[in-house]
Amino acid sequence: MNNHFKCIGIVGHPRHPTALTTHEMLYRWLCDQGYEVIVEQQIAHELQLKNVPTGTLAKIGQQADLAVVVGGDGNMLGAARTLARYDINVIGINRGNLGFLTDLDPDNALQQLSDVLEGRYISEKRFLLEAQVCQQERQKRISTAINEVVLHPGKVAHMIEFEVYIDETFAFSQRSDGLIISTPTGSTAYSLSAGGPILTPSLDAITLVPMFPHTLSARPLVINSSSTIRLRFSHRRSDLEISCDSQIALPIQEGEDVLIRRCDYHLNLIHPKDYSYFNTLSTKLGWSKKLF
C-alpha cells in the first residue's frame, strides 16, 4: 500500500448482476491490498457485507481519499454532485453505455486502479453549475449540475417564452421548447444532441443551447463561466421546471426567476495514466481514424 490514498470509498447503485460482481471484486481486492475501505450503504446491503465500515455519500466524501464509482455516467453524475462538496478524488469503472466520465475498463479495472493507487494518474478539476429558483418573497430552491441545467415544460411539450440576461444585461428573448445551459463536461451529453458545441474540459465556458427554437436565427451561445445567467418568463405558467443532470427537477412558480452560475467547488476527477480526452471523443462518438 502507498501513501497516495489510504481510505477508499466504493460507490454506486447496482442495477445489474455484473455491476454488483464488480463491486464485490473491488471490495475484496482493496481489502487484500491493505486499504481502509468504506462502502456505500446500499452496496453493503446488496452484497450482504457484515461488520464493514459503511456510510452515505456525504460520509464517504468526508472520510475517504478516493471514491470509486461503479456504473455508468448516470451513477457518476448522481454521486459526484455530492462528492464534489468534499476534498476527495473520484474515478469511475464503466458498467454503463458510453462512459464519458467512467474511464476504467471493467475487464482491466484492477490493473488500471493499481496504477492510480500508486500515483500514476491524470487529475483535472471539473466545475459544476448552481441553479436557483427564486423570488424576493420566497425561499430559494437550489441544486447543482455537473452536465447541464435544462429549462423545459414540466409535463407536456410545448413552446415557452423567456428572456435571458447575462450578468444582469439583457441578452436575448426566445420562443422555443426550452434551453440547455451546459458545462464543458456536459457538452458531450444532452447539449451535443441539441446541436451544441463540444467544449474541452479545461475551458472556463458555459454554453446556452436552444431546444427547437421558433426562429432559425437562434444559435448556441458560448459565454465565460464566471457569468451569471438569469431566466425570466414573459407568460407565467405553472408547469415550467428546470432539471439538473436529468436527475433533479425544480418547479418554477409564477413570478419566479432562475439564476444559474458556476458553483464555488469543483469535482476532482482522475483518469488512468494513458487517458486522452480526444481519444475518448473519437472512440465514443465514432469519429474517423487517422488518415496517414
From Swiss-Prot:
UniProt superkingdom: Bacteria
> InterPro entries of this UniProt entry?
ATP-NAD_kinase_N, ATP-NAD_kinase_PpnK-typ_C, NAD/diacylglycerol_kinase_sf, NADK
Which metal ions or organic cofactors does this protein require, according to UniProt? a divalent metal cation
GO BP term (any one)? NADP biosynthetic process
Q: Which catalytic residues are annotated?
A: D73 (proton acceptor)
UniProt binding sites for NAD(+): D73, G74, N147, E148, H158, R175, D177, T188, A189, Y190, S191, L192, S193, Q247
Segments forming a coiled coil: none
Q: Which Gene3D superfamilies match?
A: Probable inorganic polyphosphate/atp-NAD kinase, domain 1, Probable inorganic polyphosphate/atp-NAD kinase, domain 2
- Which EC number(s) does UniProt give? 2.7.1.23
Q: Which reaction does it catalyse?
A: NAD(+) + ATP = ADP + NADP(+) + H(+)
Root EC class = transferase
Keyword list (alphabetical) reads:
ATP-binding, Cytoplasm, Kinase, NAD, NADP, Nucleotide-binding, Transferase
Per its database record, what is this protein's job? Answer: Involved in the regulation of the intracellular balance of NAD and NADP, and is a key enzyme in the biosynthesis of NADP. Catalyzes specifically the phosphorylation on 2'-hydroxyl of the adenosine moiety of NAD to yield NADP.
NCBIfam families cross-referenced by the UniProt entry: PRK01231.1, PRK03378.1
Q: Kindly provide the name given to this protein in its UniProt entry.
A: NAD kinase
Originating gene: nadK
